[in-house]
Amino acid sequence: MVSKELSKEQRQKRIQDIIARESISTQGELVQRLRADNIQVTQATISRDINELRLVRLPIGKGRHRYALAQMTGHTDVEEELGRLFQNFVHDVDRGENMLVIRTADGHATGVALLLDRLRRDDIVGTLAGEDTIFVVARTTLEAESLMEEFHALMLG
C-alpha cells in the first residue's frame, strides 16, 4: 500500500479526528495509529503537532491518560478545570521577582499552561511549558506574589 502524503493541516486535522474518536495515551500510539492509515510520520513531527494543536492529557483512571482536544469555552469551565489540574498534577510553585515556576507531574505542564493562557489575565504576560515545568511571567513583582498565593490555594482545593 502507498503512503499518503498529507499537508501539515491535513495531518493535524486527521490527528484531531483520531483523538476525538479514540483513546490515545502516548505519542507512540498516535504514530502507530497514523501509520496504520499509511500516513508516515515521525515521533518528532507528532510531538510538534501535539504542541501546536494544544492537546491536553486527561486522566482516564488507573494511572492512565489520553490525549484530548481542549474545548472549554466559558471562563468558569477554564477555572474549574484549572483547579482540578492544580489539585491533581501540580507539585510545587516557586517565585523569583515577577517570574513563577510551576512543577507538574510528567506530561501535564502544557495542559495547565494552556488553561492559564485561556484565562487571558492582565497580570500574566505569558507562559512557557515543557514536559513537567511551566514558566509564568507576571507583569509585576506584586502580581507575581498574588499569583503564587492563588496557585497555592488552587493546589489545596
From Swiss-Prot:
Q: Does the keyword Transcription regulation apply?
A: yes
Record-annotated disulphide pairs: none
Per UniProt, what is one GO molecular function of this protein? DNA-binding transcription factor activity
What InterPro entries does the annotation carry? Arg_repress, Arg_repress_C, Arg_repress_C_sf, Arg_repress_DNA-bd, WH-like_DNA-bd_sf, WH_DNA-bd_sf
GO BP, sorted A to Z: L-arginine biosynthetic process; protein complex oligomerization; regulation of arginine biosynthetic process
Q: State the pathway, as annotated in the record.
A: Amino-acid biosynthesis; L-arginine biosynthesis [regulation]
> Where does this polypeptide localize?
Cytoplasm
Q: Which HAMAP family match?
A: Arg_repressor
| Family annotation (NCBIfam families) | argR_whole (TIGR01529)
Q: What does this protein do?
A: Regulates arginine biosynthesis genes.
Q: What's the name of the protein? A: Arginine repressor
- Natural source organism: Deinococcus deserti (strain DSM 17065 / CIP 109153 / LMG 22923 / VCD115)
Organism lineage: Bacteria, Thermotogati, Deinococcota, Deinococci, Deinococcales
Q: Which gene encodes it?
A: argR
